Curated annotation (Swiss-Prot):
Free-text function comment from the UniProt entry: Receptor for both mineralocorticoids (MC) such as aldosterone and glucocorticoids (GC) such as corticosterone or cortisol. Binds to mineralocorticoid response elements (MRE) and transactivates target genes. The effect of MC is to increase ion and water transport and thus raise extracellular fluid volume and blood pressure and lower potassium levels.
InterPro entries, per the entry: NHR-like_dom_sf, Nucl_hrmn_rcpt_lig-bd, Nuclear_hormone_rcpt_NR3
Location, primary (coarse class): cytoplasm
Superkingdom, taxonomy of origin: Eukaryota
Binding, aldosterone: R6, T134
Entries under Gene3D superfamilies matching the protein: Retinoid X Receptor
Binding site for 21-hydroxyprogesterone: R6, T134
Any single GO CC term annotated in Swiss-Prot or TrEMBL for this entry: nucleus
Name of this chain's protein: Mineralocorticoid receptor
Pfam family, one: Hormone_recep
Record domain NR LBD: where: 1-147
Keyword Cytoplasm: yes
Similarity-based family: Belongs to the nuclear hormone receptor family. NR3 subfamily.
């Protein structure tokens, strides 16, 4: 999500902006082992352009995205977790209704933002799987030297 935000802010979503010295254009994405994931992240960035996402909206959406990732072993307090999530959803609603450019269209804007969040679940899952796979591969290739 942060990668899509950086791409939106620094390159108007023309490229994937991992860091100032690591920027992927379409060709670089194709060469990557994670081409499909890059395409997905680029699409999110393009949605940011289409929606003209504000930093405040991005921040609240980022929290909601993080709160949608539940550990495999569950939570210590599901009720507290759900309350926190509900509070951030309320904050997103407030943010959308406050924005003068959204006057009269705040519910449509809220729908677009939550739809974008919902569309990211598969991408987030695939990214986590890719990261875990890459980590496992790096562990398998690790060389242990005798003392």
């Amino acid at each position: 999500f942060a990668l899509s935000w950086r791409s939106y802010k620094h390159t108007n979503s023309q490229f994937l902006y991992f860091a100032p010295d690591l920027i992927f254009d379409e060709e670089r994405m194709r060469q990557s082992a994670m081409f499909e994931l890059c395409q997905g992240m680029h699409q999110i960035s393009l949605q940011f352009v289409r929606l003209q996402l504000s930093f405040e909206e991005y921040t609240i959406m980022k929290v909601l995205l993080l709160l949608s990732t539940v550990p495999k072993d569950g939570l210590k307090s599901q009720a507290a977790f759900e309350e926190m999530r509900a509070n951030y959803i309320k904050e997103l609603k407030k943010m959308v209704t406050k924005c003068p450019s959204n006057s009269g269209q705040s519910w449509q804007r809220f729908y677009q933002l939550t739809k974008l969040l919902d569309s990211m679940h598969d991408l987030v899952s695939d990214l986590l799987e890719f990261c875990f796979y890459t980590f496992r591969e790096s562990q398998a290739l690790k060389v242990e030297f005798p003392a």
